[in-house]
Amino acid sequence: MMVIGRTCIATFRETIWKLRLNFDVKEQMMKRPIVAANWKMNVLPSEACHLAEQIRDSTTGLGVEIVLAPPYTHLALLSHLRSSQFSLGAQNVHNANSGAYTSGISVAMLKDLQVEYVIVGHSERREAFPSEKDLISDKICAILEGGLKVIYCCGESRIIRESGKEMDFVASQLAYDFRAVKLWEPENVVIAYEPIWAIGTGLTATPEQAGAMHNAIRLWLKSHYGHENAEATRIIYGGSVKGSNASDLAAIDGIDGALVGGASLNASEFSQIARAFRHHHQ
């Protein structure tokens, strides 16, 4: 009986050690900096592989998760570049699984192309397609239920910022868009704060402004989904992120990465941004 008892204890200890190891690895993966390249409607298919390979090669080994979100037409061409540090993302998705939705792309289609992330709620789509805001909740649910990950975008206009109500506005966006999400999955949701007034304008929120909003978003997550889920969720910044300002943004506690637009069309500058987040999160 004594031998059996010792064996059981040893097995139990080994199991606990493995669980703790897995938990530590999972926790590190969830909080690993993430820098996403949103190519928007740029780069021809004939040019995509060369630029994507440059981005991959210049960011390999940094310990930063890179997500490349090219136009739909490039996804199949770039699927061979995927690795543990380099993922494919889509810039949008339809909320339905299939059906008579001309031009629609479903989660299942993206998953079949080895896509891992989907951007939803980007300010450019919110502005160009006003009805988009009423579909975001359904898209988030479709993405998570389909086994993919969400990069959710939120942010305020200049008018709202100048009125001093930016915190309340972003909180209302979060509440409305995540109203159907009952169980938070921090490893599957990335929140990108992108002030609308900084998108494509050359303007950038100051590190203090960005940091304050990131803290407010995390506090909202804590109040709705709990402390551990909030702390494990990566909150990133988007809004004219460039090589010249990335280091200042990366130095702010609570900013876990960046959603990069125009600067992602230049592999050297994008690499500079990724390196900034590597240095400040080691």
Positions of the model-derived regions?
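Methionine residue identity
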Residues: 1-2
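Active-site loop-to-helix "anion-binding N-cap" substructures in soluble metabolic enzymes
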Residues: 23-282
